[in-house]
Amino acid sequence: GRINQYRVVEAVKLWRKMLTRLFETGHPWITFKDPANIRSPQDHDGVVHNSNLCTEITLNNSDTETAVCNLGSVNLSRHVTAEGVDHELLSRTVSTAMRMLDNVIDINFYPTEEARRSNMRHRPVGLGLMGFQDALFKLRHPFDSRGAQAFADEIMEFISYHAILASSKLAAERGAYESFPGSKWDRGIFPLDTLDLLEAERGVEIPVPRTTRMDWTPVREHVARHGMRNSNTMAVAPTATISNIAGSYPCIEPIYKNIYVKSNMSGEFTVINEYLVNDLKARGLWNQEMLEELKAHDGDVGRIDAVPAELKELYKEAFEIDATRLVQLTALRGKWIDQSQSHNVFMKGVSGKKLEEIYMAAWELGLKTTYYLRSLGASQIEKSTLDAKKYGYTQKREAAAPKPAVAAGSGAESALSGGSNGNGTGAAGSAGDAATGERPTRIAATAVTTDAGFAASIANMSSATEITNICSLDDPDCEACQ
């Protein structure tokens, strides 16, 4: 008889199971097929069936072609000072990197003919960035501020502008890639334009602003005249290893911990955020007692009374930042990128409703892919070098404080959208406001969901076992979450 290779399942039940497995294991890495394909420059020549392991590559695959992408990353920490971005240096770096990556295509080793064929026909490259957190530290922008949103938008537009222009200049010098005719580039459709295509396909608004700071007319005219050397130009990889070598923070992520223990063949040693140390020294606050406080509170400066409010805002760790705010930053960068970004989700609590809110916000804002879900355990290694009488026992983490519900469109929501400026105050600085306009408010509006959401889906489950698994997500005291 005929074997059915599929079965019909209820979408809501499948979604619940996906979120449960995600919370339990950090997998699966949720990828959205509609933006990955609708926004692909190569929609005329195949289908994006999957991403790569780190979820930043969205290229076509088939039985005759295996997608291959050569990657490189711009170290923002080398292009940003307290005075701002060195745009001249950054433009040269991007142009040099694009030429380098195009050269790699020709001299690379290909394990299969399918891989060689794909790379030679389409010549995709993935230029990304790292040291985003370094740049924000230097510019004094907290990660969840309007200034950070404005910077994410501005810096990615600049990199996109010069990456696309560099590829087109290479096309004028070396010729356009083989499958260029019929591509979005050939039709005059750039990454920013594809948000409108996605919006039209879904029939709902993609609440990401389409504003630009640069004059794109020369780039569009150059591409129309000479074509593109590379089918794809940008992708933000995790850069965990190369950023460590370069001495910067990885890719687009906030600082994981202000203090941690690093291990290598030479042994173990304590690493402390040098930006934080320098700021504390400048204020006369860096001493042995402050070091002990940092150790006791696992690097969370928000729990140290002696640290000024400005520094508490600037040096928030990844788990102290609302995950939906990080999604918003990725959406602002993503509108300029023709592939995707390795976006890790950091969640401090154990709320199933919050987990759904984060991933629904990612879809609504048009993200193509997500990477690991990273969560904090309820316990940690006991800090035996600290005075237990003074600091108490340090093996159990404090539960995340619940946040008050915010009605959509309320003044409180607008304040959340703006976050804080570089001075640690609640209002955004005038420069950030002028640069962003209504951007943060529009984006933040998508992160507000009804209380019914995930909680209602739990109530409707028919399996007692499934109910137990899901309910544990909302129970901080559940042993399964320890």
Name each model feature, range by range:
Residues 1-25:
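Polar, glycine-rich mid-to-C-terminal structural blocks
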Residues 5-9, 42-45, 58-63, 81-92, ...:
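Alpha-helix capping and helix-loop boundary segments enriched in small/acidic/polar residues
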Residues 22-119, 124, 131-139, 248-275, ...:
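Function-dense linear segments that define catalytic or interfacial modules
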Residues 24, 29-32, 70-75, 124-126, ...:
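Structured core elements
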Residues 32-43, 114-125, 149-154, 169-197, ...:
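A glycine-rich phosphate-binding loop feature that marks nucleotide/adenosyl-phosphate handling sites
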Residues 58-60, 101-106, 176, 209-213, ...:
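Catalytic alpha/beta core of large soluble enzyme barrels
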Residues 93-116, 142-239, 309-313, 341-342, ...:
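Internal maturation/activation junctions in enzymes
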Residues 384-482:
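Acidic, low-complexity intrinsically disordered tails
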